[in-house]
Amino acid sequence: MAIAVDAMGGDRPLTVQVEAAVQAVKDFGVEVIIVGAEAQINQQLKQYSYDQQKVRVVNSTEIVEMNESPANALRQKKDSSIRVSVDLVKAGEAEAVVSAGNTGASMATAKYVLKSIEGIERPAIASIMPSIHRNHTYVLLDVGANTDCKPLYLFQFALMGDAYARTYLHLENPRVALLNVGEEEGKGYLDLKETFDLLKQSTLNFVGNIEGKAMFKDRVDVVVCDGFIGNIALKVAEGTFDFVRSILREEVQRSWLSKLGYLAMRAPFQQLRKRADYSEVGGAPLLGVNGVVIICHGSSKVHTLRNAIKHAQECAEQKLNDKIAVEVSENLEVIKQAKIMNGESI
């Protein structure tokens, strides 16, 4: 199994992606295809000792800038590192792609080249989120791929989130909830009410609505929402952690007693930081396309990208897309009903 690594995407230099790829080969035994400026990549690889049978370099001549239009990148840069990486998956030479490049371009390229899994209308980005319990994390989706979602799309997000939780979190029967303004049935706008009804009829372990304040309380394993709300929820969570960390740092400096207290509490504070650190997961998968695509922060460091490659390896090995296909097949009647609600002909 080979993982294609987009070496030219992201805010950091190519050296970061190359080192991450080499570390992943050493630590996880995975095969990698590093895509980008071949001469520069080969020059960087000379610094490392690694199994050369597990590292391949594929040249690309174009780079998609972080602020570039996804449509422009898709139309005009057919030899970009992200396009070549995705093409490798399409050709069967790689099973997954890891990129810290332009998120919009990565999504557009994956959707255009790989196409959606049969029965899935819209791919979605899923994020692994922490909870108040050390050993519990949950899936939040969509966190940015789709801003205007009909009940059909939200229902399919739930199917994909359930499959992802089974695959990556190794859960047998994930608890699925719909993010809403209240827990009671009948809350929210019409699309959410209709989505609630669809989820009740599904094979999923649907536990109802969940409010934002309860997302971190270890009550659910999959939280479903549209990409607009999901992205806000994700960014608020990240911002809240930064806020708490800044307040703690400021208060620690106020007196010698505070500094002494910090020394006594240093280990718990380090655990808090680790549990809220996205670098342990590495990246977020674009669920619903015919291939594994892991999207990383543009500022990702070596450790983060290394873990993203591991993430991609696990999803590919565990046949994530096959599990999504099974979820779809088990809920065809509900999907058919959702399409009728959507005004589509069956």
Model feature map: region roles:
Residues A4-T15, A145-F155, I295-S300:
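Short, glycine-rich nucleotide/cofactor-binding loops
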Residues R12-Q17, D79-G92, A96-A110, E121-A126, ...:
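Short glycine/serine/threonine-rich phosphate/pyrophosphate-binding segments
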Residues P13-V16, F28-I33, E38-N42, T147-G212, ...:
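Glycine-rich phosphate/diphosphate-binding loop of Rossmann-like nucleotide-binding domains
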Residues Q17-E68:
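N-terminal glycine-rich anion-binding loop in soluble enzyme alpha/beta folds
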Residues Y50-A94:
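Phosphate/nucleotide-donor binding subsite
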Residues L88-M107, K187, L192-L198, S202-L272:
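Glycine-rich phosphate-binding loop
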